């Protein structure tokens, strides 16, 4: 649905509410730029839309190898194609990091030689395509995605680097940050505020909670990923279930790689991320129930 809405925006134009966002609220400044129009579907902005589409690519792409049924596989392939299209028209360069990060995580968690070889081959081909060739440069969306692999040539990236250096000087005296909700926006009017806009979710956490809060945040999520990975590798015996849950966890891992480059921890992106953790923790119980059902079926057949 999100990709279809993006297609409608691209070919039929924006409706009144979307035009209000663009031309009254100032969204045009970041969505109608020199490289083209960044479409945002029914999401809050193009970055949110692009990363959500990237989540669909990785989740359905990895799950495709573990599902049964021809029609279900066809449906998953159609979803992946739609998600690739949606990610492309969003013009969100950070989104490309998500499927790459998810694929890298899958290589680690798969414990399968064929999967490892396939994953490494796909990563190598992606790297060669975007870094070592100019294929598709006549397409504005491919050209924009390719620029993510050449950050030194990107003026906006260099501006972000300079801003982070200035932020670091201010944050030395703010070990607990400026306060929750004060990293961005005009919702609050505090006495003191970060003069430079945070360019990613992790930078927002750093500005709001300081180095202490950022370390705590990363530690908690590091434990979650390690714990869930351990469950998938050693606690779940059903290969199909393990593969499907691995798709969820790898998508979450790729999301945090994208969150380093862009502020994408927004609704509804946060829902699949913490759903992934919940499903992994529930995995052993689901695995046990599936095993019991299988044993019951075998007894009934006898």
Regions found by a protein language model. Give the residues of each.
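Membrane-interface junctions at the ends of membrane-embedded or membrane-associated helices
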Residues: 64-72, 109-115, 233-235, 282-302
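A membrane-periplasm/extracellular boundary helix in multi-pass inner-membrane enzymes
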Residues: 4, 10-13, 87-90, 107-151, ...
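Long extracytoplasmic/lumenal interhelical loops at the membrane interface
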Residues: 29, 33-37, 136-141, 146-209
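Transmembrane alpha-helices of multi-pass inner-membrane enzymes
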Residues: 247-302
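Hydrophobic transmembrane alpha-helices and their immediate junctions
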Residues: 64, 70-73, 101-108, 211-256
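Hydrophobic alpha-helical transmembrane segments
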Residues: 77-78, 96-100, 117-120, 245-249
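A conserved mid-to-late transmembrane alpha helix and its immediate loop/hinge
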Residues: 40-47, 83-84, 182, 193-229, ...
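Alpha-helical transmembrane segments of multi-pass inner-membrane proteins
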Residues: 1-23, 27-35, 41-109, 229-230
């Amino acid at each position: 649905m999100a990709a279809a809405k993006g297609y409608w925006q691209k070919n039929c134009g924006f409706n009144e509410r979307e035009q209000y966002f663009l031309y009254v609220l100032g969204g045009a400044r970041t969505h109608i730029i020199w490289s083209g129009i960044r479409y945002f579907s029914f999401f809050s902005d193009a970055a949110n839309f692009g990363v959500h589409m990237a989540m669909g690519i990785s989740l359905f792409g990895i799950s495709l190898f573990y599902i049964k049924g021809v029609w279900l596989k066809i449906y998953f392939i159609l979803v992946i194609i739609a998600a690739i299209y949606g990610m492309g028209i969003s013009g969100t360069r950070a989104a490309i990091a998500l499927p790459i990060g998810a694929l890298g995580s899958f290589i680690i968690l798969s414990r399968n030689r064929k999967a490892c070889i396939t994953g490494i081959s796909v990563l190598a081909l992606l790297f060669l395509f975007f870094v070592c060739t100019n294929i598709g440069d006549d397409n504005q969306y491919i050209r924009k995605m390719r620029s993510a692999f050449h950050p030194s040539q990107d003026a906006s990236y260099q501006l972000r680097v300079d801003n982070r250096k200035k932020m670091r000087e201010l944050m030395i005296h703010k070990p607990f940050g400026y306060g929750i909700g004060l990293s961005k926006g005009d919702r609050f009017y505090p006495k003191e505020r970060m003069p430079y806009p945070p360019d990613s979710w992790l930078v927002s956490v750093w500005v709001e909670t300081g180095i202490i809060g950022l370390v705590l945040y990363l530690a908690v999520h590091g434990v979650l990923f390690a714990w869930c990975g351990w469950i998938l590798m050693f606690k779940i015996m059903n290969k199909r279930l393990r593969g499907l849950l691995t798709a969820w966890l790898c998508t979450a891992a790729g999301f945090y790689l994208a969150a380093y480059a862009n502020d994408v921890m927004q609704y509804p992106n946060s829902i699949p991320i913490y759903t992934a953790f919940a499903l992994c923790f529930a995995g052993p119980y689901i695995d046990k129930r599936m095993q019991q059902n299988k044993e019951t079926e075998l007894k009934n057949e006898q």
